[in-house]
Amino acid sequence: HQLWFADGEYVHFGGGSDDFVPTNPKDDQFYRCIDVRNPTKPEEVGRWWYPGTREGDSAPPPPRHPDIDSGFRAHNTNVYPQRPDRMYLGYLDGGTFIMDISDKSDPKVLGEWNPHPPYPGFAHTVLPLFSKDILIVTDESVKDDALDWPKLAWVVDARKEDNMVPIATLPMPPPDDFRNRGGRFGAHNLHENRPGPSFQSDDLIFGTFFNGGLRVFDLKDPLQPKEVAYFVPPKPDNSPVATAQINDVYVDENRIVYCVDRHAGGLYCLELNI
């Protein structure tokens, strides 16, 4: 479903494998690292899964979320040149992990943070802001009509990797204005400051919120994030829901913003004017 390939050498992704039998069918994808330095012979060099999610684990299976069980699966697996020995991992109902991958054959947990429960799960993206020692963590909305509300974008203090502390959330579109518009409403993807020719900022954060559109936040003060721009297009033709569903976002080095609709709206190209 997701992969990270930024250094030309290693592919980091969440996926399954024939030799991995989950203790629960919802837990069938885990972190894998593939060495592609010889592209004619890709080779797995490391893997990690949430303890207790594989048959035969010494740990017991993890308790299920009491409200909406989304499972314990690896999602985004981000690795950056600023800290090539770290991997920033969202693990759905398992929460957020900072992993030590200095030895790719033996990934180790350095820190974890998980507010689910009491909050609904589905930790999706973990974006490190290195100059601030801050993580932006999104929990993806996966139910129409806000049935899994609140799905938030968290601001997490990661100065101590083994003791991460939430200090704020990104301001959400007004729930009373959006939750009944149709489709999903809540956090999803972020512009991830991808290495290479892309827009890079630890101050401007771009996020998609389905029927809440694209939102841009000023994070100069992580304790008080502020919304500074938004884009909510009209319902696209032929959409199965009654509103736009802005799904993903990428910002290039020229400050052109690309975002896509989940269903029928296609690609929107926007110019950043802030």
Model regions and ranges:
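Feature marking well-ordered beta-strand scaffolds used for ligand recognition
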Residues: 1-274
